[in-house]
From Swiss-Prot:
It is an enzyme of class 1 (oxidoreductase). GO terms for cellular component: cytoplasm. Its cofactor is a divalent metal cation. A divalent metal cation binds at residues 121, 131, 169, 199. Gene3D superfamilies: Coproporphyrinogen III oxidase, aerobic. This is Oxygen-dependent coproporphyrinogen-III oxidase. The lineage of its organism: Bacteria, Pseudomonadati, Pseudomonadota, Alphaproteobacteria, Hyphomicrobiales. One of its GO terms (molecular function) is protein homodimerization activity. Its main location: cytoplasm. It comes from Rhizobium rhizogenes (strain K84 / ATCC BAA-868). It is found in: Cytoplasm. The keyword tRNA processing does not apply. The record marks 199 as: Important for dimerization.
Length: 303
C-alpha cells in the first residue's frame, strides 16, 4: 500500500499519549503471557505427560542503557515449542540511509517507538502458527500500526474454508467493523499483499489484517480513536487465537505431518529475513537482536 502524507505536527500532550500506549502494550503482554501459560496447563492430548511451559522474562537496554529498551518473554513448552511475547520502547535517531523510509524522519531524524510483538510456534502441526503486533511510532508525525496473521502448517488446513480460517477472519472483521477509523477489506488485502513470498509466488499463511500509518483526523476521532482500535486488535487476538489452539491441541499427528510443519516453518524464516518490516526496523534502530530474531522457529527443514 502507498504511504500517505501524514501531518507534520504533534499534539501538545504527546508525552501523555506515549505513556498511555506504552502502558497498554505492557499490560497486554502480561495478559497474553498468562493466557498462553493457561493453554500449557490445559493440554490433555499428546505430550500431556510433560511439564507445562512457563515464560522466562529478560529485560534489555539499548546502547549502554541509553535509547530505551524492553522486555523479552520466551517460553518453550508442551503446547508451544517456542513462543515469544515482547514489548519495547525505544528512541533515538534514524540512520541517514533509513530516514527516507519513515514518515517525518527526513525533516528530523529523531524517533520514539513503543509496541508489542508476539509469535507462537506450536508443537502440534494441527495448531497454526500465529503472529501479532501493534505499535505506536512518533517522529515529526505520529501513527499506529500492526496486525495479526495466521499460518496453518498443514496443506489440508491452508484453505479459506477451514474452520480456523473462518473463525480468525471473522474475529478480525468484527474488530474492524466496531471502529470507524478501521477498514477491514483494505486491511485484509494489505495483509495478503504484505505476507507474500515473492520469490516463491505463494502466501505465508491464510491472512488476517495488516495496517500502518494510522493517523485519523480529529473529525474521525483522532488519536483516541486510533488507540482504541489498536487496543481492540490486541483484545480480539487474545480471544480468538486461544480458542483456535484449544480446538486443535489435543489432536494426534504423524511423522509426515511433522515434516510438513518443518518445511512450512522454513517459509516463515525466509519471509522474516527477506521481507519483514519489523525485523528490518529493529535491526536498523539498534534493537535487541536476540529479541528480533526470536520470531524464527526453533526447528526448521528445507527439502
Amino acid at each position: 500500500m502507498e504511504r500517505p502524507n501524514l501531518p507534520k505536527e504533534l499534539p501538545e500532550d504527546i508525552e501523555d499519549k506515549k505513556e498511555a500506549a506504552q502502558g497498554w502494550f505492557q499490560s497486554l503482554r502480561d495478559a497474553l503471557c498468562a493466557e498462553f501459560e493457561q493453554l500449557e496447563d490445559e493440554l490433555a492430548g499428546p505430550l500431556s505427560d510433560q511439564t507445562p511451559g512457563r515464560f522466562v522474562a529478560k529485560d534489555w537496554q539499548r546502547e549502554n542503557g541509553e535509547g530505551g529498551g524492553g522486555r523479552m518473554s520466551m517460553m518453550e513448552g508442551r503446547v508451544f515449542e517456542k513462543v515469544g511475547i515482547h514489548t519495547s520502547t525505544v528512541y533515538g535517531e534514524f540512520s541517514p540511509d533509513f530516514r527516507s523510509q519513515i514518515p517525518g524522519a527526513e525533516e528530523d531524524p529523531r524517533f520514539w517507538a513503543s509496541g508489542l510483538s508476539l509469535i507462537a510456534h506450536p508443537v502440534n502441526p494441527n495448531v497454526p502458527t500465529v503472529h501479532m503486533n501493534t505499535r505506536m511510532v512518533v517522529t515529526t508525525s505520529q501513527w499506529f500500526g500492526g496486525g495479526c496473521d495466521l499460518t496453518p502448517m498443514l496443506n489440508r488446513r491452508r484453505t479459506q474454508e477451514d474452520t480456523d480460517s473462518v473463525l480468525f477472519h471473522r474475529a478480525m472483521q468484527i474488530v474492524c467493523d466496531r471502529h470507524k477509523v478501521a477498514d477491514y477489506q483494505r486491511y485484509k488485502a494489505w495483509c495478503d499483499e504484505y505476507f507474500y513470498l515473492k520469490h516463491r509466488n505463494e502466501s505465508r499463511g491464510i491472512g488476517g489484517i495488516f495496517f500502518d500509518w494510522l493517523h485519523s483526523t480529529e473529525e474521525a476521532g483522532g488519536w483516541d480513536a486510533d488507540f482504541a482500535f489498536t487496543r481492540d486488535v490486541g483484545r480480539a487476538f487474545s480471544m480468538v487465537y486461544p480458542r483456535i489452539v484449544r480446538s486443535n491441541f489435543n489432536e494426534t499427528w504423524t511423522e509426515e505431518d511433522r515434516d510438513e510443519q518443518l518445511i512450512r516453518r522454513g517459509r516463515y524464516v525466509e519471509f522474516n529475513l527477506l521481507y519483514d518490516r519489523g525485523t528490518i526496523f529493529g535491526l536498523k534502530t539498534g534493537g535487541n537482536v536476540e529479541s528480533i530474531l526470536s520470531s524464527l522457529p526453533p526447528v526448521v527443514r528445507w527439502p
